[in-house]
Amino acid sequence: MNSIQVKNEPMLASFASTSTNGKAKRSAKPSLFSGSEVSSDDDEEKPLAKRPKVEDSDSDAPLTSTVSSQNGVQKRSGSSNNDDNDDDSDSDSDAPLTALVKKSNGSDDDEDDDDDDDEGDDDDEEDDDDDDDDDDKPLSKSSKSNRKPPKTMSITGSGEKKWDVLIHKGPRFPDPYQPLPKDVKLKYDGRPVDLPWQTEEIAMFYAVKLETQHAQNAIFNRNFFDDFKTDLKKYPPRDGTQIKSFDKLDFRDMYNYWRSLKDAELERKKALAPSARKREIEERKAEETKWKICLVDGVEQRVGNVNVEPPGLFLGRGAHPKAGKVKRRISPGDITINHSADHPAPQPPAGMGDWAEVVEKKDVTWLAYWKENINGQYKYVFLDATSNFKTNSDREKFEKARKLDTVVKQIRRDVNKNLKSKVRHERQIATIVWLIDNFSLRAGNEKGEDEAETYGVCSLRCEHAQIKMPDTIHLEFLGKDSMKFEEDLKITNPDVFKNIAMFLKSNGMKDKSGNYVRKKPSDPIFCAPESGSGKMQPLQPNSVNQFLSKYMKGLSAKVFRTYNASVTFQGLLEQTEEWLKSRPNAAEREINQTNLRLAYNEANRQVAILCNHQKTVNPMLLNRNLERTQDKIFQIRYEIMKEQQKILTFHKVSELKKEFKVKEHPFMKQFDKIMQKQDLDAEKVKQYEEQMISDKKSKLESTFKRQQSELQYQLEQKGLTGDDGTPKKGKKAKNVEEEVRSSIKGFKDKKQVDEELKALNETAKRLEKERKTNKSQATSCNFVSSAKKILSKYEMIKKQEAELVNKNNTSDVALSTSKLNYIDPRITLAWLKEWDDRLSDLGQGKAAPKKKVKKEEEENDIKPKKKDAKGAASKKRAAKTGLANSTGDSEKMELGLQVMNISQFFANALQKKFKWAASGDDGRDISAKWVFVKDAQSKMRKLDSAERKGQKGGSMAAMTDAADSKEAQPKVNCVLKKQTSADRKMSKPIKAVDKTEESDDDLSSDSSDDEDKPLAAVV
């Protein structure tokens, strides 16, 4: 097979990166690992690796001889077809397969190429693709001496033809690197270093992260410097500088230059006329659309993320060991294109060489793939989430999870039976399935030493677990994407608890003396002897899926997670009204849109915790949120103080109490609160008022500049300016100019702006006088109005404080991941319809006045009006046929809601992705009575972790547990509480095994047989 040379060097505009011979190769089909696609869509298309089948014929034979690699070791045959292999992927198994897959973890979340990753909203987790396909991949060997390169297969699909004609433009490349000006240099030991552009670019990767949390990470810095030194050997400084110490590097000049470019671009955009800015955006979107549209069998389909990831530094998620390593620039010579052979293939950018290969694979749906250098993952360009391929995949995934409901009782009965099996392998599988089912843990994989050490149930080591009598297991390990999992799991099934304690102690094998071999901390909890060496290796997730597939074709651990997440979510939403009634104050108990959204988010939060959907905590963002909230609260308290000042200037407290009786004025019950002194720092009040006036002046001046820029731009477009840019004279030109002025929203001339600036100066003087005299300069005061304003502002403070608590409680919980990948969207839509009908019945169905105001404002806006009644046709069709979503009139779903706003629950991207969900099982518009499963509340899963991530006021699940504590299946009896760093510090050190004599006695006291003793290992 011809080899393809992967170009790791970054490129200049004039630098062409090619394959080995400088031309595109039509080589034999390259071998690939399974990897992740570029887009943030669900990875359901990625195929699973072919797996070796474990023969179970002698699984119950005891191991009576000494531990060795000779006879008595279980043999593994080659890969064989089974149900799990046939249908374990929830959709198109069309990405390249491998015979043995190196587990690729730590999907990079650093698509940005600057420090804006720390400035965005951390709740934007739609790019967190949380598939568990990795659960089904075979394990890599952990032994350094025995590790071999993985064997691979050629590109293969599912065998089923997906398309006849596929035409697209290929992936889009990032801009080439532009060298720095000669006066901007990296400094070493205080002296400028003359770097060639290849290493200068890598230094710039670090410079742009200088003011982020990443630059404070020792692992990040070490990995960067290691890669930087490697490149310095290839492209050393031209002035001969020897760079040996990271601490002597100074990136400040490079950062300042980059920051100046960012600031200049921001100022340029601010200076643009609104119409010019809008036109610029439209042109950019039009250019992007050329890349984002492809033809599949003559039908236009949207493509997902077509952009090749730009080079930079790998950020990773969690405590990723490869954070800071250099992501190399991808060239056309690294990319394979999938395209119709009878149509011209897309051309790579000029001067960058040819594609590695162009193929025609009609049984796959990827458009292109390439390999990234950090984790060896293959990244793919797929169609967009709204494409037919993806929407069908999503529906099939959730329908498979619904089908599980028909066999789940039988599975659980058999699991409970196998927990007491004499066959160790069966008992291990049953214990694993019980943990996956009850705690929604991932099956997981062991990693090689060159990969991020992350784990799931199957690959857990003894050092990850600690027995806590009488019924608790403490687990602490790095989960998917290097996110830390640390929980105390209360095991309600005594057999499970006893099994785990047993598996922690021994693998069932005996030494020469006939004693059971005690496990070491690094030994796997669930294990079987490896073929050939006899060494105990973690049980493969494939073993779990083989067990599950006996009950339903394609059933895997991930389907269980999807089923439990959706069932629990439905069960929680069914308790919405009860949860609202349980809220601590009257305002929170009201049935309205705001409180319903809080109830929905509470259910979403609990399911996210159930699935252990974490996200990287950004301390800088948390601090900014805290500062912003504190500033908002100070502003509100300042406004309260000014109202109080006004009241005390015009009224006496004693007279107010006499004049305004509680009977006629109920708000007087809170009179003491109304007049409570705010105790604001005088200097801070002065600074706030001065800043407030300054901000208003700046806003007024910037608005004036923007309006003048808009006026100039529109006159230029109409040809009414001279060569010097000044407006033309003449009656006609003047009339047109007046029309343009009137079309600009809120247009003010220079005279009006000067008058307002003068008024602001007067306000500043008035505020200064009020500070000195502590008397209001207002002309009058309406006490009732001021009192009600003060009380409303106290409520605003409560909301701000509650929002801050909510953000802190969910700072490490990825709410959107479960909604995107694990919760059937039809549950949300049916719930929305139900409550929309109820709110309409309560008289809350009238349109909000805000929309009318918006339309009136748009008449005077410079921007073109939006299309009115975009969904009117769909609503009329729905009224007649019940099929509002049967045609492609809109990319988003049409539910015909009168009160509830779907955008508050599903962002536009999710509405497009889940448009299929607006139709029920009968193909008609989804009904408010649609359910994922019947009797969901009795099937909800347990959630111990939420007991420490509780939210004051209780949770829906806590009510479920209190209402029916007799259910055999434990429910989500929890409240949510954010775990603090102090909580973690109080945790006891992890032990491989609880070796106390009391533990051994407790484990054996309730059994008359030898179930508590280590079972014989399979041979």
UniProtKB/Swiss-Prot annotation:
GO cellular component: a single term: chromosome
Positions with biased composition (Basic residues): 864-879
Isomerase recorded as keyword: yes
Enzyme class at the top of the EC tree: isomerase
Superkingdom field: Eukaryota
Gene3D superfamilies xref list: 1.10.132.10, DNA Topoisomerase I, domain 2, Topoisomerase I, Chain A, domain 3, Yeast DNA topoisomerase - domain 1
Region (Interaction with DNA): 379-380, 442-447, 556-558
Extent of Polar residues compositional bias: 62-78
GO molecular function terms attached to this record: DNA binding; DNA topoisomerase type I (single strand cut, ATP-independent) activity
Any Gene Ontology biological process: DNA topological change
Subunit-structure text: Monomer.
Record-stated family: Belongs to the type IB topoisomerase family.
Additional observations: Eukaryotic topoisomerase I and II can relax both negative and positive supercoils, whereas prokaryotic enzymes relax only negative supercoils.
Role played: Releases the supercoiling and torsional tension of DNA introduced during the DNA replication and transcription by transiently cleaving and rejoining one strand of the DNA duplex. Introduces a single-strand break via transesterification at a target site in duplex DNA. The scissile phosphodiester is attacked by the catalytic tyrosine of the enzyme, resulting in the formation of a DNA-(3'-phosphotyrosyl)-enzyme intermediate and the expulsion of a 5'-OH DNA strand. The free DNA strand then rotates around the intact phosphodiester bond on the opposing strand, thus removing DNA supercoils.
Annotated protein name in UniProt: DNA topoisomerase 1
Organism: Mycosarcoma maydis
Lineage of producing organism: Eukaryota, Fungi, Dikarya, Basidiomycota, Ustilaginomycotina
